[in-house]
Amino acid sequence: MALLSFERKYRVPGGTLVGGNLFDFWVGPFYVGFFGVATFFFAALGIILIAWSAVLQGTWNPQLISVYPPALEYGLGGAPLAKGGLWQIITICATGAFVSWALREVEICRKLGIGYHIPFAFAFAILAYLTLVLFRPVMMGAWGYAFPYGIWTHLDWVSNTGYTYGNFHYNPAHMIAISFFFTNALALALHGALVLSAANPEKGKEMRTPDHEDTFFRDLVGYSIGTLGIHRLGLLLSLSAVFFSALCMIITGTIWFDQWVDWWQWWVKLPWWANIPGGING
């Protein structure tokens, strides 16, 4: 693949965290580095083990292939390969691949002399994954509380986990996470629409500037966050959504064991609701 006109001058040696100059090269447009090799190794090994699991399961249908964690009776110990051991090794591979990819992003940032915002953001995705397959199962005492690797089976796990604690929508951290997800979608949809509007003016007119974009929202709602500010806001909203998604899971079954609707009894029991005729406490 041909280099872009400006690309070659940014391909400079150095900035590596591990391995020195050994893997400090590119394959086409892709920077390799030690962590690129590590990512490939972990990803390839994980895929091979998933294929092995498919052989043991007796199906090659992608919708039916599923790698299950060990049964609850194994606790936090190792399990035979066919009874959850493959899931444990694949989880190690997935974690290794994700962390290596993030560190590869760090090396690219070091080469370009830019901030570490991208690997920092990706670290939140890793946090969410590890919450489900490592932190929460360890806190609950068994790998069997983690989700299986399968298209349909992991959806069944989500449903079963939710209904185990009643209506999961009453989980306050879940409420906050969903609010951030929707707000993030709204903010970035408005941002994308605004940029496309400025880039596609009426026929015969020049492309509009950020001043036009700012003026639109000042006219609309009285305030514009600005071209840089909207990206800061988008990052804040998206990271908050991921953080509270992880939080809503880590507190379920570890510090809260009942149905989530019961958590809201503190609201019902507030003194100013008491003795209201026809009210819940009346």
Swiss-Prot record:
InterPro entries, alphabetized: Photo_II_D1/D2_sf, Photo_RC_L, Photo_RC_L/M, Photo_RC_L/M_CS
Transmembrane segments: 33-56, 84-112, 117-139, 172-199, 226-251
Record: residues binding Fe cation: 191, 231
Record's GO cellular component terms: plasma membrane light-harvesting complex; plasma membrane-derived chromatophore membrane
Membrane topology, from the record: Multi-pass membrane protein
Topological domains, Periplasmic: 57-83, 140-171, 252-282
Membrane topology, Cytoplasmic segments: 2-32, 113-116, 200-225
SUPFAM superfamilies found in the cross-reference section: Bacterial photosystem II reaction centre, L and M subunits
Subcellular location(s) of the protein: Cellular chromatophore membrane
Location, primary (coarse class): membrane
Record's keyword terms, sorted: Bacteriochlorophyll, Chlorophyll, Chromophore, Electron transport, Iron, Magnesium, Membrane, Metal-binding, Photosynthesis, Reaction center, Transmembrane, Transmembrane helix, Transport
GO process terms (BP): photosynthetic electron transport in photosystem II
Binding site residues for (7R,8Z)-bacteriochlorophyll b: 154, 174
Binding site for a ubiquinone: 217
Family, as annotated: Belongs to the reaction center PufL/M/PsbA/D family.
Function: The reaction center is a membrane-bound complex that mediates the initial photochemical event in the electron transfer process of photosynthesis.
Quaternary structure annotation from Swiss-Prot or TrEMBL: Reaction center is composed of four bacteriochlorophylls, two bacteriopheophytins, two ubiquinones, one iron, and three highly hydrophobic polypeptide chains (designated L, M, and H).
Protein name per UniProt: Reaction center protein L chain
Naturally occurring in which organism (per UniProt): Cereibacter sphaeroides
